[in-house]
Structures are given as structure tokens and as C-alpha cells.
């Protein structure tokens, strides 16, 4: 302000915001003239917004349409690294969509969410089994106008990574972790038709090298026994059971320790 003359400077995302600001200042008692040096923010189409998490640290990138939205997004993730910039071109519903994306990010311990206008992509690793299940139904809860275009989620890490199979002579029960849902089908298919196989497997990341091949080979050898149990804990394998004779015992032992 120079005497009774005011000059507005800064950046706005719409011409309407500039007109409104000029009108507000002009209505101030004692102000005679108002000059606007406010610049329009760069227009971005599509309008980008992204958030990522790594080693517990969240980073926000892309654009925000107003300082109000900027503050709201930072408040939603306290301590986030802010690399966002003020830009124009945000679609209607941007803030609600961004909050929805940040809520999804809270279910990840590694990965990110990204918007192109109101189209959302999510990729990463779930922080828990419950979070993994929650993310699978994300599109059903999306705000009006938001499209979940891609959802690539890995299950949470299991440590130790465990798996076990028990054969009682007539049926097999399998429990523990699995890197994918297809493994249960492969295990059931590996048993003879007259040996029912029940599986209670939890999806998890962190499987040791060769895990899937090992489970199939171990099940094959377990079924050579009259009864027994085999277990994997990370890279350690344990097998005990009752073989029909010394020849079977030697063959199974050699196969498991190879």
C-alpha cells in the first residue's frame, strides 16, 4: 500500500480469484485505487498429484490448486516432505480425490499413489493382511468421478516366512505363507486324487528363493511316507515322519537334503 493506493502481487489459479481479491481490497475503507500484479499459475492438463512412502517417509509431489487445499493435504500427512507446486487446471473434486488417495497410501509401507486429473493408480506393498484386503475393494469406495485405473499391490512381508504340511496317512493339511493365490491350487493338484488336501495359506511377500518349487517337492516326498510333517521357516527345512522302510527313508532324506 502506497498511501491510499494498493498493489496486489502473487500467484492465483483463476482469474476469478484475482477479481475477488481486487474487490476485497478495493472495499477496504481508505483505499482509493487497486492495481493487480497477480500472475496466473501455470495451467496443467491433466492435473498431477502424487504421494509416495519409503522407509516410513511420505513425499508429496505434483500440484495443488489453492493454499487452502495445500494446507489440507499437508495436514492429512503430518511430517510429509512437500514438493508440490501451485498450479491451475485442477478438476472439480480434486481435494476429496487427493484425500482418498492419501487414505489409501496409509495402507502401504512402501509404494505410492498418483493422480492424473481424477484417474488414480496405486502400486506398492501393503503394511498388513488387513490393509491388503482393504485395498482390494478400494474402487468400490472411490469418490464420485474418481477412477481407480491400476491397482498393483503386493501382500505384506512375513518374517519369518513359514509353511508346513501334515500328512496323517489319508489327508494333507497345509498352513503358513504363500507368495500368490495360485500356489494353493498347485499344491492340491500335486496330490493323488484319493488324498484330499486342505490349505490355509496367508498371502505374504518375503518368500525365500525357490520357495514355491520347494513346497511342491516337499509335499511330493511327504506323501511317500505313511505319515509325517514337513515345515519351512525362511531357509530352514524340517521333515519328520514314518517311512514304510529304510529304502523310502533314504530316498526321502536324500531328496529333502539335496
Regions found by a protein language model. Give the residues of each.
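N-terminal targeting leaders
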Residues: 1-258
Amino acid at each position: 500500500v502506497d498511501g491510499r493506493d494498493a498493489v496486489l502481487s502473487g500467484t492465483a489459479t483463476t482469474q476469478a480469484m484475482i477479481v475477488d481479491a481486487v474487490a476485497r481490497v478495493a472495499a477496504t475503507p481508505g483505499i482509493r485505487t487497486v492495481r493487480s500484479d497477480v500472475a496466473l499459475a501455470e495451467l496443467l492438463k491433466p492435473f498431477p498429484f502424487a504421494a509416495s512412502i519409503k522407509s516410513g517417509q511420505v513425499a508429496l509431489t505434483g500440484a495443488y490448486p489453492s493454499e487452502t487445499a495445500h494446507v489440507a493435504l499437508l495436514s492429512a500427512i503430518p511430517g510429509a516432505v512437500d514438493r508440490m507446486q501451485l498450479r491451475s487446471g485442477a478438476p472439480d473434486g480434486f481435494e476429496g480425490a487427493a484425500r482418498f488417495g492419501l487414505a489409501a497410501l496409509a495402507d502401504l509401507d512402501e509404494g505410492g499413489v498418483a493422480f492424473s486429473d481424477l484417474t488414480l493408480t496405486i502400486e506398492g506393498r501393503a503394511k498388513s493382511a488387513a490393509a491388503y484386503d482393504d485395498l482390494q475393494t478400494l474402487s468400490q469406495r472411490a469418490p464420485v468421478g474418481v477412477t481407480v485405473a491400476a491397482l498393483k499391490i503386493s501382500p505384506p512381508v512375513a518374517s519369518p516366512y513359514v509353511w508346513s504340511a501334515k500328512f496323517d496317512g489319508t489327508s494333507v493339511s497345509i498352513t503358513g505363507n504363500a507368495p500368490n493365490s495360485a500356489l494353493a491350487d498347485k499344491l492340491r493338484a500335486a496330490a493323488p486324487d484319493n488324498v484330499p488336501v486342505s490349505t490355509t495359506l496367508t498371502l505374504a511377500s518375503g518368500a525365500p528363493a525357490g520357495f514355491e518349487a520347494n513346497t511342491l517337492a516337499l509335499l511330493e516326498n511327504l506323501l511317500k511316507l505313511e505319515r509325517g510333517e514337513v515345515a519351512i521357516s525362511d531357509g530352514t527345512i524340517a521333515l519328520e515322519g514314518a517311512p514304510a522302510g529304510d529304502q523310502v527313508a533314504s530316498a526321502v532324506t536324500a531328496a529333502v537334503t539335496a
